[in-house]
Amino acid sequence: MNMHVDMGRALTVRDWPALEALAKTMPADAGARAMTDDDLRAAGVDRRVPEQKLGAAIDEFASLRLPDRIDGRFVDGRRANLTVFDDARVAVRGHARAQRNLLERLETELLGGTLDTAGDEGGIQPDPILQGLVDVIGQGKSDIDAYATIVEGLTKYFQSVADVMSKLQDYISAKDDKNMKIDGGKIKALIQQVIDHLPTMQLPKGADIARWRKELGDAVSISDSGVVTINPDKLIKMRDSLPPDGTVWDTARYQAWNTAFSGQKDNIQNDVQTLVEKYSHQNSNFDNLVKVLSGAISTLTDTAKSYLQI
């Protein structure tokens, strides 16, 4: 099938499998000077950086543990290195900025040059594919902004929970060789602070709310105006499982509580990990989109120049 037609159909409906296939074959097409992975990295768009930083944040969160009594011996919990989460947010923000800059470069340098060639030098009508490229680029910018905002917000939330889990070490201790003391009231207050200050995110104007609700699932809720709010249910379960200050539990009861409490922490981790996987998929889609866009613009520019030479 004509590559022109393939590109037009894939770009118009944002058919990601088709775009991926085109991105793989386009560099071999003599008429399409598509960007390569090396070109993307040279432009500062290297998806490996934010994804590695987010992976490090997930690993750091997973390594957190509460104090426990094992074989009659009290074992301290493990605190988090919170700077790992800051690093992840900075990487996500920087990657989004590089992605947006690249799209704007395509829009101003490549797409603008194509329009000038087609329109100013003879008044021919641009290819129908060209007419939709600006809209495709605009939608790409919107998706970048939305994902960066949401991933940054979820990472901040992740960090807040990690901070609480670290501070729990200060309120759980061994009463004696058979019992554990837990100041649950103080821990409740810490969790409530997280609930009261959950980050909210705003989707870009004109975002497809239904699509984003389906994309993000029940880890968040999205209002009709595009405000994204983190679902606090898991934190509420953690908070409500806690006893009053000064409570003493035997080892068996404490370990049962610890298992349930840590299970909710793991559920939060799963929510964030799922979003990070979707973010990774979105980055892959972006790379393929840019490769196809650059190839399409290159092809259309050559077509317009050939027309003018007739």
From Swiss-Prot:
A GO cellular-component term linked to this record: extracellular region
Q: Which residues form a coiled coil?
A: 127-171, 250-299
Taken from the record, one Pfam family name reads: T3SS_TC
> Which compartments does it reside in?
Secreted
Q: What is its main location?
A: secreted
InterPro entries recorded: BipD-like_sf, IpaD/BipD/SipD
Does Secreted show up as a keyword for this record? Answer: yes
Record key words, sorted: Coiled coil, Secreted, Virulence
Q: Does the keyword Secreted apply?
A: yes
Q: What else is known?
A: Human meliodoisis patients have detectable antibody response to BipD. However, BipD does not act as a protective antigen.
User: What family does the database annotate?
Assistant: Belongs to the invasin protein D family.
Biological function: Required for invasion of epithelial cells, as well as for survival within host cells, escape from endocytic vesicles and subsequent actin-tail formation. Probably regulates the secretion of effectors BipB and BipC and their final integration into the target cell membrane.
The family database entries (NCBIfam families) matched by this protein are listed as:
SipD_IpaD_SspD (TIGR02553)
Q: What is known of its domains?
A: The N-terminal domain is an intra-molecular chaperone that prevents premature oligomerization of the residues on the coiled-coil region that are involved in interactions with the needle and/or itself. The residues in the C-terminal domain probably form oligomeric structures at the tip of the needle that are responsible for the regulation of secretion of other effectors.
Query: Mind telling me what this protein is named?
Result: Translocator protein BipD
The organism is Burkholderia pseudomallei (strain K96243)
The gene for this chain is bipD
